[in-house]
Structure formats: C-alpha cells, structure tokens
Design a protein with these regions (language model features):
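Methionine residue identity
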Residues: 1-2
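Phosphate- and other anionic-substrate recognition elements at nucleic-acid/protein interfaces
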Residues: 5-183
Length: 183
C-alpha cells in the first residue's frame, strides 16, 4: 500500500516509530535521480556510474581489494541500480587458477552489492552488446574487439577523453545499457 506525503512516496511498512519519533524510509525507485552502475567484473574490468540523464558521475578501473570495492560502491548506494556482466563460468582457455581467481573476485563484487542493498541484475555480454548493434567478426581477435567497444564508448562519452580505456569501456557501455533499459 502506497501513501503520498508532500512530494514523496512512502510505503506503510517503511514507517517506523521509535519513542514518539517517526522516520520515513524512502522507497527505492521513487526518486528521479537514479544512478546506474555498470560493472565489468574481473581484475582487468571497471566500474562506471551514470546519472539518469546519461552524464558520467564516475568511472574507474576495478578497485584492487574487496575493501576498496566496498568503499567505492558505498559512495553511490543511494537510489542506484546495478548491472553486472554475467560471464558465467569464466573465460574459455583460462587456467583453473585464473578461473578460480575470477570467480572469487566476482563473488566479492556480488557480496559488496548485496551488503549495500543495491538492486542488481546480471546481463550476458550478448544482451548488452545487442543494444549497440555491434557484432564481433569471426576474424577479430580479443584486442581488436575490445578496441571496437572502446571506440563505441568514446563516441557515446566524448567528454571523458582518456578515461575511456580498455578496462573501463565495457563498464561504461553496461551502465549505459542499464540506463537505456531503465532497470
């Protein structure tokens, strides 16, 4: 059941009374100033934060430690939505040690998002890339494909200049995907 108080929506269950003091907890999603977080998991990935209007709030290469990840994401936990790339079981051709490292790092990201109560959706690379109408050619190697993605990110965010790197381009495109689909 929704209740309307001047200019804000509140849920009846979010009203809390403590010794004559009433606090109202704002429902997520009712604020128009939503932040969209895009995460390209992995040690060589990145995190991008976009405002609702498409302007870039922040973009960084992947923080190194779990504490750094948590500290960075906690800056943007209010009224945010996150889309994280669902790579599945790792990257084909990697050693078992590299796959385990990737899985551990991915778990750290997911736990940080869970601890901060940030609504999160996993999306496959095929799904978010389809929004940009890009197709990988069979003769393209990984570096050539990453350069295509980097060029697309640079065309969407020309104001960033050198901040669009091979580490951050996927995160920027994923956060723009989240903004466009209004997750």
């Amino acid at each position: 059941m929704m209740y309307y108080f001047p200019f804000k929506f509140y849920n009846l269950y979010s009203l809390a009374c403590e010794s004559r003091r009433i606090s109202f907890k704002k429902i997520k999603g009712m604020n128009k100033d939503i932040l969209y977080i895009g995460i390209d998991p992995g040690v060589s990935g990145g995190i991008a934060i976009l405002n609702n209007d498409g302007s870039v709030k922040d973009v960084v290469a992947m923080p190194e430690t779990p504490r750094d990840i948590l500290d960075f994401l906690s800056l943007y936990k209010e009224d945010s939505r996150c889309v994280i790339e669902d790579v599945g079981h790792g990257i084909p051709g990697q050693s078992s040690k590299a796959t385990a490292t990737f899985a551990r790092h991915n778990g750290q990201l997911e736990m940080a998002l869970l601890a901060l109560d940030i609504p999160t959706e996993k999306v496959t690379p095929q799904k978010w890339i389809k929004v940009y109408q890009l197709k990988r050619k069979k003769e393209q190697d990984k570096n050539e494909w990453k350069n295509v993605l980097k060029a697309k990110a640079q065309s969407l965010f020309p104001q960033l200049g050198k901040k669009v790197t091979l580490k951050t381009c996927d995160a920027l495109l994923i956060s723009e995907y989240a903004r466009r689909t209004k997750f």
